[in-house]
Amino acid sequence: MRLTSTSFANDATLPVEFAFGKVASEGHVALSSNRNPHLAWSDVPDGTLSSFVVVCHDPDVPSRGDDVDREDREVPHDLPRVDFFHWVLINLPADAREIVAGTHSHGVTPRGKKGPRPDLPVADGVRHGLNDYTGWFAGDADMKGDYYGYDGACPPWNDSIVHRYVFTVYAVDVPRLEIPEHHALTGAQVLAALQGHVLAEAAVTATYSLNPRLAG
């Protein structure tokens, strides 16, 4: 199975239009265009293929927030890192081969895009999961809410490392993952539900930083 994107090259910098945040002309961070990137997959398995799942995660998020966005320091490079899910999309039909750039997100939506089935050009049964901005903004009176669908990169502006954004497409042997409709669909729940059902997978990775020292 092969995954490609016309929006970025594998292991190259994510263009700012596909990020949630960008380096500000004044201050540190400004909101960006927040468009979802293009993804296309090929060489899919034959036989029992029934659906696809798309996940985007950042494996480089600081495990503690003590140093995040502090003027007098950077987040240490050796701090343990954890996953942050930016996009969870399940039950894409077996004949799907592409997601067009900007069709699942275009601009930042304060308090989050609607879900689990936003008004998007997708087939019946497709579900958008909650991304981890739901937890990140939980204490922000202006931004808190349920963040469904894609919301792009916005790493700490003082992080000492460049973050990676891993887009993975899974070919699955069931038409719908067994996750109760009333449950809030998270990245962790999807990865658990995928166990034993993945026929093939492919990934592409983009990098991004808001640290002027690293962003160039």
Question: For the regions a protein language model found, what residue spans apply to each?
Answer:
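N-terminus-centered regions that define maturation/targeting leaders and the start
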Residues: 1-216
